[in-house]
């Protein structure tokens, strides 16, 4: 396909046009008084949302060159989303401000490479300052504040996420589901839950709710198929003498063995339930080993030289309670704390070593199941459109609170970056010179952009607000919801340091790339050929 090649100023201006379009579409959502954006969908109802990265992903322009500019800024948003899960709009606004200021300098004859060096050095300095400013959070109140701000000032959501974190711990998993009611609810599962239910409904002890509840059961864990009932007889006899229930978790149970278990259960000889092991292949084995650690038992596997027919009672795990329905199994166990901690450390090491996002996700799930538990937030709303918007806000809020726990919090509402401008100026004047200093000045001039946009979206004059904030103490900022200047930390208007840091780093990275662009090679727009004229028909006197 033929290409169009554009050089120098013309190339950078074309990129700038695309960047302007995307930045403006995303920036309208910033702050407590930010508006929504409607996305038209090819199929189904339009989506009304307030989430920067989702809007950025939807924007495609007709002009290929301008579209390249859109793609660059979109990258700043999605990288921030990947790293911190929130702050995508801030990253877009920052990147846009840096590109605008930088292009003016390049047009005036500044060396783009030196400017980029200055931008990178300024960015590194600011990252270290954000780390210094960050206050670690421990209490549930600060977590709730973080969630509230990220969810667009929804206090109920903030409190719900704080409760969930309280219950499942920092390592715990908080997942989102679309609820069936109008209200958003929180459901917390203690212990380990996995997505496999009983093999036969005859194992249910509560026929009304179709649940099997086993109190203080023994747990037999094996990674092989149980084909013959003879394999199970020795261990079943030992358990029958104790009078305790038994849960069998195996790769599969063949019909004959299953029938024997069901008959014993129905006759009241032995309270037993059987479940298929979760996962596949190596992952299944790893999850079974996790369960063995959690229940203080052993995984009966031929790799370790253990066979079912010579399994002893002390090889079996124990739990306080096991609840099984047709889809899930929940084990509430009080395992050996030291062993569980050791296993968690092992999983964390594996997470550090793997490059695959999918593997990381699965390891995080395993870690959560071992360490804390699982909290499920069931999102409720009146319409599907509202549900989707709410779900995206909740996702941001969950990510923001996790980021806050990791790296601490800083004053929110664009305040931190605005105050850091004067620190950057002092540092740059004594450490940089020439065009590198100009590069640092570009970053310094852009730092107030998020605050200015928040103020403008609230109907105030952005430049005036930014100047007022700069003249106040470092934790003071502008509360766009009320129009007052207040102590942001005391008022609970906070941002996770990780979100602020990621947004700044990604914006600086993209700005540097755009400024050092000297040539663009893009596809030529395809000419639509006129449709050929229709044929003369079939001929003859036929009526078609």
Curated annotation (Swiss-Prot):
GO molecular function, one term: isomerase activity
Classification of source organism: Bacteria, Bacillati, Cyanobacteriota, Cyanophyceae, Synechococcales
Positions bound to ATP: 29-32, 86-90, 413, 479-481, 495
Record organism: Prochlorococcus marinus (strain MIT 9313)
Gene3D superfamilies according to UniProt: GroEL (3.50.7.10), GroEL-like equatorial domain (1.10.560.10), TCP-1-like chaperonin intermediate domain (3.30.260.10)
Localization (cell): Cytoplasm
Protein family: Belongs to the chaperonin (HSP60) family.
GO terms under cellular component: cytoplasm
Protein name: Chaperonin GroEL 2
Catalysis: reaction(s): ATP + H2O + a folded polypeptide = ADP + phosphate + an unfolded polypeptide
UniProt-listed Enzyme Commission number(s): 5.6.1.7
Stated role: Together with its co-chaperonin GroES, plays an essential role in assisting protein folding. The GroEL-GroES system forms a nano-cage that allows encapsulation of the non-native substrate proteins and provides a physical environment optimized to promote and accelerate protein folding.
Gene Ontology biological process terms, A to Z: protein refolding
Assembly description: Forms a cylinder of 14 subunits composed of two heptameric rings stacked back-to-back. Interacts with the co-chaperonin GroES.
UniProt entry keywords in alphabetical sequence: ATP-binding, Chaperone, Cytoplasm, Isomerase, Nucleotide-binding
CDD domains assigned to the protein according to its UniProt record, in alphabetical order: GroEL
Main location: cytoplasm
